[in-house]
From Swiss-Prot:
Cofactors required: Mg(2+)
Gene designation: aroK
Subcellular location: Cytoplasm
GO terms, molecular function: ATP binding; magnesium ion binding; shikimate kinase activity
InterPro entries associated with the record: P-loop_NTPase (IPR027417), Shikimate/glucono_kinase (IPR031322), Shikimate_kinase/TSH1 (IPR000623), Shikimate_kinase_CS (IPR023000)
SUPFAM superfamilies attached to this UniProt entry: P-loop containing nucleoside triphosphate hydrolases
Protein name from the UniProt record: Shikimate kinase 1
Organism of derivation: Salmonella typhimurium (strain LT2 / SGSC1412 / ATCC 700720)
Sequence positions that bind substrate: D36, R60, G82, R140
Binding, Mg(2+): S18
Catalytic activity, as annotated: shikimate + ATP = 3-phosphoshikimate + ADP + H(+)
NCBIfam families the record matches: PRK05057.1
Pfam families for this protein: SKI (PF01202)
Listed GO biological process terms: amino acid biosynthetic process; aromatic amino acid family biosynthetic process; chorismate biosynthetic process
Amino acid sequence: MAEKRNIFLVGPMGAGKSTIGRQLAQQLNMEFYDSDQEIEKRTGADVGWVFDVEGEDGFRNREEKVINELTEKQGIVLATGGGSVKSRETRNRLSARGVVVYLETTIEKQLARTQRDKKRPLLQVEAPPREVLEALANERNPLYEEIADVTIRTDDQSAKVVANQIIHMLESN
């Protein structure tokens, strides 16, 4: 991979986008960004607070702006928020400005990986987490698939193994 293409990780919460993204960036000697962390940095508040105060629409507007700015950079790995693909603009920008890698996982793995995480605003509701995750999957999985250049299942693999798979797939394309 002589020239460094942007690599954008999409997928549901708990798929490993941030962990795998950091590993991938380290292995490729690229800059890593996480859209949720960028929002937190810019607002001085955590994602849950932004969600509570501004609602999902306000949060998504911030997310769209942050992703637009970040995707204009060169040679980065970006872990996007699970719902970022709801925006057609964001989907178009991701597709046009880099390689989109869809990190796929099962509802069971999502439940296991997110059960103690209080920084997941969409799971801080009355409905059972499984039902919430299933509804999100029904809405978002087709959007991830629509823009994915590469799809990798992350269920029982370490971040390093998945990062190596991504590198191998990128080198063979």
